[in-house]
Amino acid sequence: MDHLLQHQDVFGNYNKAREAMGLSYSSNPTPLDNDQKKPSPATAVTRPQPPELALRCPRCDSTNTKFCYYNNYSLTQPRYFCKSCRRYWTKGGTLRNIPVGGGCRKNKRSTSSAARSLRTTPEPASHDGKVFSAAGFNGYSNNEHIDLSLAFALLNKQHPGSSSQLGFHSELGSSHQSDMEGMFGTSQQKENATYAFGNGSSGLGDPSRVLWGFPWQMNGESFGMMNIGGGGGHVDQIDSGREMWTNMNYINSGALM
C-alpha cells in the first residue's frame, strides 16, 4: 500500500512538471499529435534530377551534308530546331542519301533535232521498179525547194521543142538521162509527156497560155486550139502525158517533204 502511494506521487509530480513545461500528456494521441509526428514536405529529402543531354542534329553530324535530307515529318516525336543548319528535325526521321526531287533529265533538244533530220531526209522514189532521186533535176538538192511557178514561167521564153522549158536545161541529154528514162519509161511516154507540157508547138505559143493551166485543165476550145496548132497533139498523147505529170508531181512532193 505504501508502495502504491509512492508511485502515484511520482506520477503526479511528473504530470505537474509537464504542465509547467507547457506539455500535456494523454493516453490516447490526438490527430494533431499524429500530424506533428509526420515530417514536413520542406524537410523531405528530394533527389536531384539529371540534366537533359544536349541533342545533336543528325543533319549536322552526317558526313554526306550535300545530299543528306532529314525527314522531319514524324508527328509522333517532338520537333527540334537546329541553329547551325537552321532546320527542324525529329528523332523519328530517317536519313536519305539522295536529293528530294532529284533525277536524270533527258535531253529533249537532241532528240527533237534527230527526229527532224530523219523527217527532212527523203527516201529515194521509185517508179515501175526503177529507183531514182530528185537531185538530178536542174541541180537541185534534196533539201532545196523546187519553184514550179518559176519553171513554168520560162515556157514563154524558150523555143518550142526545147528541153529546158521546165528548168531541166540539158540534163535530159546528159548524165541524168537515165533518171529521166526511169521516170518516163519508154521514149514514147516521154514524147507524150512533151506534148502535155507544151513542147512541139502544141498550142502554147501564146505567151499568156502559161497562165491558163495545164492542157488537161483547159476546156474544149483550148483542146481545139491545140489540135489546130502546128504540133498536131492528140488526146491519147495528152492523157499519157497527164499520167506522167502526176507521177513526177508525186515524186517532187516526196522529195520536198
UniProtKB/Swiss-Prot annotation:
Q: Where does this protein hold Zn(2+)?
A: 57, 60, 82, 85
- Point out which parts of the chain are Dof-type zinc fingers, as ranges: 55-109
Region (Disordered) residue ranges read 23-50, 104-127
- Keywords, in A-Z order: DNA-binding, Metal-binding, Nucleus, Transcription, Transcription regulation, Zinc, Zinc-finger
Description of the deletion phenotype: The pear1 pear2 tmo6 triple mutant variably displays reduced radial growth. The pear1 pear2 dof6 tmo6 quadruple mutant plants showed a greater uniform reduction in radial growth, associated with compromised symplastic trafficking.
Q: Where is the composition biased (Polar residues)?
A: 24-33
Its induction note reads:
By cytokinin in procambium. Induced by the transcription factor MONOPTEROS (MP) in cells relevant for root initiation, and later in vascular tissues and hypophysis.
Q: Which GO terms describe its molecular function?
A: DNA-binding transcription factor activity; transcription cis-regulatory region binding; zinc ion binding
Q: Which GO biological process categories is it annotated with?
A: phloem or xylem histogenesis; regulation of DNA-templated transcription; root development; root radial pattern formation
Q: What is its main location?
A: nucleus
Location relative to the cell: Nucleus
Matching Pfam families, A to Z? Zn_ribbon_Dof
Expression across tissues: The PEAR proteins (e.g. DOF2.4, DOF5.1, DOF3.2, DOF1.1, DOF5.6 and DOF5.3) form a short-range concentration gradient that peaks at protophloem sieve elements (PSE). Accumulates in the stele.
Q: Which domain of life is it from?
A: Eukaryota
Q: Where is the composition biased (Low complexity)?
A: 110-121
Metal-binding is among the record's keywords:
yes
Q: Give the stretches traversing the membrane.
A: none
For the keyword Zinc-finger, the answer is: yes
Task: Return the GO cellular component terms, semicolon-separated.
Answer: nucleus
| Function as written in the Swiss-Prot or TrEMBL entry | Transcription factor that binds specifically to a 5'-AA[AG]G-3' consensus core sequence. The PEAR proteins (e.g. DOF2.4, DOF5.1, DOF3.2, DOF1.1, DOF5.6 and DOF5.3) activate gene expression that promotes radial growth of protophloem sieve elements.
- Protein name, please? Dof zinc finger protein DOF5.3
Phylogenetic classification of the source organism: Eukaryota, Viridiplantae, Streptophyta, Embryophyta, Tracheophyta
Please name the gene that encodes this protein.
Answer: DOF5.3
